[in-house]
């Protein structure tokens, strides 16, 4: 951290950190989308910056003898100013519920549509998968020339899903994927509130604890 960054007010430090995280995520998606990149987590540690990459094909992201990961690490240091990046690549299929990643669902829909499967059928399959995975809430939107020459969209929603506010921005997961078919480009947007998510306005009131009574002989 530079001397200028150390002198920044707290709120500006937070803004700078969030901006850098956004830039890292954008770079990773741009660089690795063709290798099965799904999502990433960026964590500040005393030793530097830990970056966890979730992917469908981890070996392609790592590269032969780690060449691709080393290249990404060098760019993060030299171009984005990331301090000591430590990159871990995790196979998303080995996670307990990969359906909690919206990009996994969006890619499944896009791939099925590219194979000629009707969009409504694919959407309902995705709904069943998300419900079976225990999602708290979700929204699936497919837009494009669905049944006429004019572009329109079809939307399916379920459960509790905030679309504005802190929770919508920082806790609800969102992904957008595009697929090019003969009629034109289609957009697939997926928002998911994971099963583990606890909204800011949700709280549990613990029942009062009864005092223990002791009898004296």
Curated annotation (Swiss-Prot):
Top-rank taxon, per record: Archaea
Keywords: Ribonucleoprotein, Ribosomal protein, RNA-binding, rRNA-binding
GO molecular function: rRNA binding; structural constituent of ribosome
Family that this chain belongs to: Belongs to the universal ribosomal protein uS3 family.
GO cellular component: cytosolic small ribosomal subunit
Biological function: Binds the lower part of the 30S subunit head.
One Pfam family matching this protein: Ribosomal_S3_C
Subunit structure: Part of the 30S ribosomal subunit.
Domain KH type-2: 24-93
Gene it is expressed from: rps3
Name of the protein in question: Small ribosomal subunit protein uS3
């Amino acid at each position: 951290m530079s001397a200028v960054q150390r002198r920044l007010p707290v709120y500006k430090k937070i803004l700078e950190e969030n901006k850098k995280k956004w830039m890292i995520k954008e770079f990773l998606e741009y660089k690795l989308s063709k290798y099965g990149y799904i999502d990433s987590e960026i964590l500040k540690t005393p030793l530097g910056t830990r970056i966890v990459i979730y992917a469908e094909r981890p070996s392609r992201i790592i590269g032969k003898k780690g060449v691709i990961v080393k290249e990404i690490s060098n760019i993060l240091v030299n171009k984005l100013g990331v301090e000591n990046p430590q990159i871990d690549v995790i196979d998303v299929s080995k996670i307990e519920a990969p359906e909690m990643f919206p990009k996994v669902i969006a890619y499944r829909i896009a791939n099925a549509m590219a194979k000629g499967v009707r969009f409504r059928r694919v959407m309902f399959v995705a709904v069943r998968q998300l419900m079976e995975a225990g999602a708290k809430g979700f929204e699936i939107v497919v837009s494009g020339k669905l049944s006429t020459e004019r572009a329109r969209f079809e939307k399916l929603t379920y459960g509790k899903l905030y679309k504005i506010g802190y929770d919508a921005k920082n806790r609800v997961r969102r992904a957008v994927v595009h697929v090019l078919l003969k009629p034109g480009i289609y957009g697939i947007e997926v928002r998911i509130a994971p099963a583990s998510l606890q909204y800011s306005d949700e709280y549990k009131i613990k029942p009062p604890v009864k005092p223990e009574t002791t009898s004296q002989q």
